[in-house]
Regions:
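Replace the tail clause
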Residues: 1-190
């Protein structure tokens, strides 16, 4: 029993959601499956709906349970994945969006990811099906290649993230800038 709305929304799901724990990653390794990780945050209503939308399609449920170790993550509770979401969205020139569906190797290297943006074309099930067709086929054809390539991509991504972090311009007057930003935010609500 895990606390929070994100996990409660998936309790009765026919998808065999697992928590983000070592045993789940080991399950993926032993079964030679990718992990299908859905990172959500409870503050967004669409996050609670995503597991139920996926669960409403019997063919998606069967494919997820057969092909992946499905993992549901509360981005607030598992902060490292919440932070990873920002970096992954940045990599595809997208704003930060939750929930984020990520296909990961058993070594936790992202293979592919897609933000599940509400009110955009395509339902959650359609987005899953399209991506599954591509990612699932690549994994079936040569999971060794996918693992090596994803590891290399993750190393390169980490290097880019470190460079971006070191290039960030820090404020010369953090207190004054913070106060100015707070005043600007306050005017939005006046």
């Amino acid at each position: 029993d895990l606390p929070g709305m994100v996990y409660a929304a998936a309790e009765a799901s026919p998808i065999h959601w697992q928590p983000w724990v070592k045993e789940s990653r080991e399950m993926a390794r032993k079964s030679h499956k990718l992990m299908l990780v859905v990172i959500a945050i409870p503050q967004q209503a669409s996050c609670a709906l995503t597991p139920s939308r996926l669960s409403s399609d019997p063919s998606a449920v069967a494919e997820i349970n057969r092909s992946y170790v499905p993992i549901l993550v509360d981005g607030d509770a598992v902060r490292e994945l919440g932070i990873l979401t920002a970096d992954l969205c940045s990599e595809i020139s997208s704003g930060l969006h939750f929930p984020l569906m990520v296909w990961m190797t058993p070594d936790c290297d992202p293979v592919a990811w897609i933000p599940l943006v509400p009110n955009e074309s395509g339902s959650v099930v359609e987005l899953f099906s399209q991506s599954h067709g591509m990612v699932g086929n690549m994994w079936e054809e040569d999971h060794g290649y996918v693992s090596r390539n994803s590891r290399m991509d993750q190393e390169n991504r980490s290097a880019r993230i470190r460079i971006r972090a070191s290039e960030r311009e820090l404020s010369a007057e953090p207190a004054a800038d913070s106060l100015r930003a707070l005043r600007q935010l306050t005017t939005l609500y006046d």
